[in-house]
Amino acid sequence: MLRPKAGKCLLCSFRAAQKPVSQKWPSRALSMRTRLPSRPNRMSLAGAGKVSSSPTKEGPARRKQDGPFGGMNLREAKIRGVPERPSAAQERRTSRLDHRDRDDKKDRGFHALKMQSPLAPVSYVRRTDIKGRMNEVQSFEQFALLDSVKQAIFQQALPELKEHVPTPVQRIAVPALLGDQQSRRPKSEMEQYLIAAETGSGKTLSYLIPTINAIKVAEAKDAEVKAYEKELQEEKLRQNNLTLVSPPLSNMPHPTTGRPRAIILVPTSELVTQVGTLLKLFSHTVKFKAAVISSNFSGKVIRNRLFSPSGIDILVSTPHLLSSIADSDPNILSRVTHLIIDEADSLLDRGFSPLTSAIIDRATPSLEKLVLCSATIPRSLDSFLRKRFPDINRLVTPNLHAIPRRVQLGVVDVERDPYRNNKNLACADTIWSIGKAAAEHDGPVKGLMDVKRILVFVNEREKTQEVADYLVSKGVDAIALSRDTPEQRQSEMLASFTSPAKLSVEKPVSHPGSLSDNQPNYVPFGEVAPPVKRRLPNTKVLVTTDLGSRGIDTVAVRHVILYDVPHSTIDFIHRLGRTGRMGRRGRGIVLVGKGDRRDVVKEVREGMFEGKALI
């Protein structure tokens, strides 16, 4: 039996025994309170105990009236009648809802092309503004040109046209280069222009017309030229007289001998010949001296053309040749007032940029106008111009970077039957299909059929000869053009593809490719029929690389075959730009095989159909 200790009553002993048990509960409750997460402050209402229990009054709440100091310490002006700007979170929620409601196809746009994006964009707002300015010009008569220049345009440059209407790029570039538009910079500074327009739109004429006009205007004001012409005329009068006159003691050369007024730089010798041919047409009516020099000519011919006693007004050359001449004779750039760089996207890239920039620097002291011309504005060219020429005046057309809708693009899947990844077979079959379809229709003369000129583009120059040999083995008239081809031979090859004259051959009695003309309808017993080689007489094929895709005016080409898928949209634009030139229709065919970017081809085709500018 338990007994309480002495000195303590039973009640005190019971309280002492219960005291430690009662102390366990607060510590346990404290530990549980620390384990549970605390309730955030945003979950509890401020002043919840002070909420009135009275029912709310019906009707809108009264607007809070600010006191006399309510406009102090505000970050935004609370102006009545101006809607509040939504927060960033509200804009994100709204944009997400809009994207859900849109159609997926409309929202996607170019996905595969965005991975490359080699072209500098031009806003559609600017394109629309350019369209409005273009409509103001409808004829060459509206340009402030000399009468002789206008006559040369109608009779020499564009004789085959019934209506002489300037193209979009000519409506924009010619007035600007003539000085019709007011320039913000002083006349003493060099004027800088960039002409950018789609392929086959007449860019060459857009810079030749103002340049020739400016040269003739400056020639009329040149005192040295006037004095030379006066002395020359007096010499002719003395020679016509019957009296004997002693010969002149010195034979004074022309003031422009070896010092041209305008220089046109192009990347290849083929373009040198092409631009020179157009200048020669102008020179029949507008009297000026033009010379073309390239590696196709010997040193003696180049020297005679540059330092001709009759002088030189316009020089067409390549950067390599002109740079080497300027090193030995710097005076060749001393009187240059107009410097035109055609195919600027090529001449200002890594390969040509040092030479081209050096020529620009040497000609800058006397230079009045610097004109860059290109069918595309790559990002590399755009960044170069922003650094070197930040104030350049960009003259672009609304359809820049867009392949014309008059050019149709077809796709041949080489992986399927009957080709089975044989691109050579697919290329030959495509050419045979074009030739057979053309042979079914007579040409302008009965019994004759037109010859179809076809360009085949490959990515590697080693492939050109291989594809050409295969096509020849299949009865197709094909030749290869690459850097390995001699330059004289290159000009001969391109002559038949750049000439606008139609070619025709005699139409065979049987269908092209049939065996009835070459094989008897019977074979003697025990003998084997001789092998028969089919031949397609109404086609001419040129297999080339990007050498033939820049600037060559292939007006006679209606079909372009892309043997390899181009590396970028820039190559797409230049290769497909060899057809459908100057408003004509054309057709491009892409051979898509294993490993090719089908998504890129698909988006380019959709962009062509919708008339969009590629990126």
From Swiss-Prot:
GO molecular function: ATP binding; ATP hydrolysis activity; RNA binding; RNA helicase activity
Signal peptide: none
UniProt entry tagged with the keyword Signal: no
Residues that coordinate or bind ATP: A197, E198, T199, G200, S201, G202, K203, T204
E.C. number: 3.6.4.13
Subcellular location: Mitochondrion
InterPro entries in the cross-refs: DEAD/DEAH_box_helicase_dom, Helicase_ATP-bd, Helicase_C-like, P-loop_NTPase
Location of the Helicase ATP-binding domain: 184-395
Keyword terms: ATP-binding, Helicase, Hydrolase, Mitochondrion, Nucleotide-binding, RNA-binding, Transit peptide
Domain Helicase C-terminal: 444-615
Function per UniProt: ATP-binding RNA helicase involved in mitochondrial RNA metabolism. Required for maintenance of mitochondrial DNA.
Protein name stated in the entry: ATP-dependent RNA helicase mrh4, mitochondrial
Record organism: Sclerotinia sclerotiorum (strain ATCC 18683 / 1980 / Ss-1)
Encoding gene, per UniProt annotation: mrh4
